């Protein structure tokens, strides 16, 4: 299966008649493996800051998580495994695997829990596959 199919079929999937706003799979070097057409252009330093928070949990909390110039307030995640952020009625979930970052961005009517399930389920599967 191609990386684009993982984004299209597993991250941008139907969720009770809705879907994520945007999604991507990135390498831990910040390279784009695959992304939805709606995924925002991001800066390398934004990905570097996200990776730093996975290595040193809590580093994003004081400043917020930035992706594509959008600031998200960091909310409870799973240290070293999942970072979650909130902005208004939407937010972001980032799951780290051994080789990649899976990113899902949502807005109402998709709920934070629905985004978490979609992103983390695929991340867990990729971890089981050694990716």
From Swiss-Prot:
Location of this chain's protein in the cell: Cytoplasm, Cytoskeleton
Alphabetical keyword list: Actin-binding, Allergen, Cytoplasm, Cytoskeleton
Any one cellular-component term (Gene Ontology): cell cortex
SUPFAM superfamilies: Profilin (actin-binding protein)
UniProt keyword annotation of Cytoplasm present: yes
Entry-linked Pfam families: Profilin (PF00235)
GO molecular function, one term: actin monomer binding
Principal location class: cytoplasm
Function: Binds to actin and affects the structure of the cytoskeleton. At high concentrations, profilin prevents the polymerization of actin, whereas it enhances it at low concentrations. By binding to PIP2, it inhibits the formation of IP3 and DG.
Assembly and binders: Occurs in many kinds of cells as a complex with monomeric actin in a 1:1 ratio.
Similarity annotation: Belongs to the profilin family.
Record-given protein name: Profilin-3
Organism from which the protein derives: Malus domestica
Organism ancestry: Eukaryota, Viridiplantae, Streptophyta, Embryophyta, Tracheophyta
């Amino acid at each position: 299966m191609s990386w684009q199919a993982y984004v299209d079929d597993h991250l941008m999937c139907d969720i009770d008649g809705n879907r994520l706003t945007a999604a991507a799979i990135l390498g831990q070097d910040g390279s784009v493996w695959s992304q939805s057409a709606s995924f925002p252009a991001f800066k390398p330093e934004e990905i570097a800051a996200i990776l730093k928070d996975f290595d040193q949990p809590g580093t994003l909390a004081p400043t917020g998580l930035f992706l594509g110039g959008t600031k998200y307030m960091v909310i409870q995640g799973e240290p070293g495994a999942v970072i979650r952020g909130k902005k208004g009625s939407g937010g972001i979930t980032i799951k780290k695997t051994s080789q990649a970052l899976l990113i899902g961005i949502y807005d109402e009517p998709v709920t934070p829990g629905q985004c978490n399930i979609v992103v983390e389920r695929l991340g867990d599967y990729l971890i089981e596959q050694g990716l």
